Each structure stands twice: as C-alpha cells, then as structure tokens.
Amino acid sequence: RYRAATGREPTVLLEPDPPGWLTGTLRLAGWDPASCVEWAGAPARVDRLVVPLHRNRYFTPRDGQFADDFNPAPGDVRWLADRMQSNVPDLDAGEFSPRVFLSRRDTATRPVANEDAVRETLEPLGFESYALGEMAVADQVRLFANAETVVAPHGAGLVNVIHATDATVVELFPEDKVEPYYFCLARQLGFDYHWSVYPTREEAMVVDTGDLRATVSRALDG
C-alpha cells in the first residue's frame, strides 16, 4: 500500500547474516533479499521512517490480559499468506499428511524429552512428524496449506498456521512457557484451538502421552 500510494520502494532492514527461513520468507512475499540492507542495530539516521499501522503488544499471561491485546489483524495475516502462496508452485501437490505433528528434533531450545513416545502416540491417529528446520520455506507453506490438524509444542513454527484454510490447532506448552500468541492467532483465523500444559525436566518438556491422546482425540472429534 505504501508503494502504491507514494511510488517509493521502502528499504527493508535485516539482521546481519539473516537465516535461511527469513530470506526464504521474504522471497516468497515478493522482496528480493539482495535488495535489503543488513543492519546490526547501531545508531542510524533515516530520511523517512515507515511505521506499520498494525503493531502488536507483546505481553505475558501475568499481565492479566491473556486473550485480548495480542490481536494480529486477520486481513494482514491473509494478505501475507496469499502473497506467499501465490509464489509457491504445486501448492496442492498432496505430498504431506493433513495431520501434522511438528517435531523439535531440529532445535536445541525447549526440546520434548519423550518425543519418540509422542510420535508413537500420534501415528495411529494418522499424524506424520515434520521438522520445519529441515524443510525449505516453500515446502513449509505447502505443508500447512494442506493441513487439517496441527499438533505442536509451543514455538515459532506455529506461525505457519496462517497458510491453513480451516485447521484445528493443538498446542503443547512446557509449564514454564505458557504464552498466548498462537491461541490469539488461531482465534483470529477462526480455527479450533486446544492446548495442554506439561512439566519440564532439565529444560525439556515431558508429555503425558495419555493426556495427549485424549486431548488430540477430542480435537479430532470436535
């Protein structure tokens, strides 16, 4: 909209040595990462600063505003999803399961201590395990565009639900990291949302597989 209204091409600032998921996302959203500027956060002077209309307030449940203040605009979310999907060929190729479990085997933060048991619990229900860090951004878009049910430990990979059409989300929280971000995102998109909280041991979440089976079964029946 800024470009259409002003005829100016805004400069996008990136962190130094940006990760592949970031450059891949920019490329699918229509920006060439090569035309962006890497900025380490040092003091800088700009002639014109563009401030987006929709800004989100970050908070924790302890603020007492768990559900109401983190409200990404649905129109903005859909705009980004539509723009990215328009640049992904074979979006409906059908190569991924519509029942998705997001593994954390590709990250050192907030691992699942008994992930093998979690996977064995979900497989009879038709779920397949995917590690997003091992997938190209375009494949992540394809995965979520065809997803019907997503079971995932709390983590940034759940942002990809913006590519789903009508999904059910089951979020698994470690007891020391209960945050509202993806509940609010799912709510804004009109998705069914379920959650469970589990204890941690040495910074790894320990999932009660009996509770998980019951929670996911309720979600599938809903």
For the regions a language model picked out, list residue spans one by one:
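The feature primarily captures lumenal catalytic ectodomains
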Residues: 1-222
